[in-house]
Amino acid sequence: MALDKNQIAQRIAQELQHNTYVNLGIGIPTLVANYIPKGIDIEFQSENGVLGMGPFPFEGDEDPDLINAGKQTITTLSGAVLFDSATSFAMIRGKHVQLTVLGAMEVSENGDIANWKIPGKMVKGMGGAMDLVASADNIIVAMMHTNRQGESKILKKCTLPITGVNCVKKVVTNLAVLEITQNGFKLLEKAPGVSVEEIKKATAADLIIEGEIPEMKL
């Protein structure tokens, strides 16, 4: 069965490493903060000026003065700091954020990402995504495998305006975990109950498949 958004975030949380600085983009990535493995200390940074972001608050505990870049209410951990956007982007552009988790509309087999504009639709701008993809050493994309029309978002080449080139290292979707290699998308894991054939059918790029593909463990 395909994963839901929370399960995608739960799987991505398994990629987090102890004592690292992580930025979570808008959408599915913001859910990752709810699934930190035990024994792992992570400093979550939000580009609107938060370092030490915690999980989402319980209903009734929301503080309207504490929000993430997607305007969602958040919690902060002990020792958290708040600062202006100039300081936030100095952290990002200075490569002090080691991992960025972003949503996307398309990802290509060479690691290009398109996640800020659909032609013909009004948008306010690309936000901080271009700074993030140009600065982080490790970028993981969290998204659905196909769009609402059933068209694959895993492509040989992006068709939408590009946010960054050759930057994505791994993609986690509702169907699969994919690693981007020099030769294209390598299938690492499949969602529970989803077959390799179903993943291939939903992918508009060639897949590197080596041996038996394990199911994700959540």
Model-derived features: positions:
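Conserved phosphate- and dinucleotide-binding cores of soluble alpha/beta proteins
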Residues: L3-Q7, F58-L218
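N-terminal active-site beta-alpha-beta segment that forms phosphate/nucleotide-binding
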Residues: M1-L77
